[in-house]
Amino acid sequence: MTIPWRDVFPAMTTQFRRDESLDLDATGRHIERMIASGASGIVMLGSLGENATLAPEEKRRVVAAAIEAAAGRVPVIATVVETGTAAAKQFARDMERLGADGLMLLPAMIYRADPRETMLHYRDVARATQLPIICYNNPLAYHVDITPAMFAELAEVPNLVAIKESSGDVRRLTDLRNAVGDRYVLFAGVDDLALESAVLGADGWIAGIGLAFPEENQRLWDLAVAREIEAALPLYRWFTLLAHLDTHVKFVQYIKLAVQEAGLGAEWVRAPRRVLVHEERRRILKVIHAGLEGRPKLPKARKPRPRAR
């Protein structure tokens, strides 16, 4: 499949039942809703997908279910996150054989690699597969920062094609463009920096809280890339109160609860995560319900959307 590297690629949750078993039917239904809302691709097994709680065979089942649900309409991107490079290479090959359209690759977990080690990890995994790869940079969560200078060195690796930029510093997008030009597709990776990222030239958005608000998420991006900023601002101000849920250590529980309250899935998570209780639950529900009850009328994007790069 030729991947349209642009616009909204939701980072899907992995749906579970109360007993923590996989609910692949619910996962498939949620994927269907995201495609219907206009998603250009779907990302499986990321942080929101609770990758670390899944056994290898479960990961394969989740991606296989996503491929079946997408049915060739949008690309399925499988996330590769392992503690060692050898395991990451093997999983990348597994996903290619399974039929994933692309990969999103994280640095190796637990050990905090230095820049040379990090770049070798990305080079080695990229050599193990023909699939195109999104490089995920999230130093706040994973304690390894892939800097613009490092991406300039990695630019010679042909199947490292995109960057999910989640440093939380929107200046990084400009620094990346200055360092590597248009060599990589740039995805916004932080929900409450989506509009700012679009204005600074991000090509797409790997979205989180939009799982509960898919139409609003898509329209916000459409307005942003069409530079309809005046129309986008009221929607973004409403959306940002919800998007802040994506920046907390419990973002998985928060977003899954929002998905449940929106009628698009269930909040069940896998231990050590637990569903929210008591005052925290009441506080987050208040934010979610305020968003649901205050949904604005969606403005139309008047200008044509920019063509794909």
Predicted regions and their residues:
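Active-site beta->alpha loop and helix N-cap motifs at the rims of alpha/beta catalytic domains
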Residues: 2-10, 15-143
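Catalytic cores of TIM-barrel enzymes
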Residues: 2-4, 184, 259
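Short, amphipathic alpha-helical "lid/cap" segments that border enzyme active or binding sites
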Residues: 24, 28-31, 148, 281-288
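A general structural signal for well-ordered alpha-helical segments in protein cores
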Residues: 27, 59, 63, 88, ...
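Alpha-helical structural signal in soluble globular domains
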Residues: 37, 61, 65-70, 94, ...
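Short secondary-structure transition/capping segments
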Residues: 54-57, 90, 115-118, 146-148, ...
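Catalytic alpha/beta core domains of metabolic enzymes, predominantly
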Residues: 127, 139-247
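Structured C-terminal cap/extension of enzyme domains
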Residues: 195-309
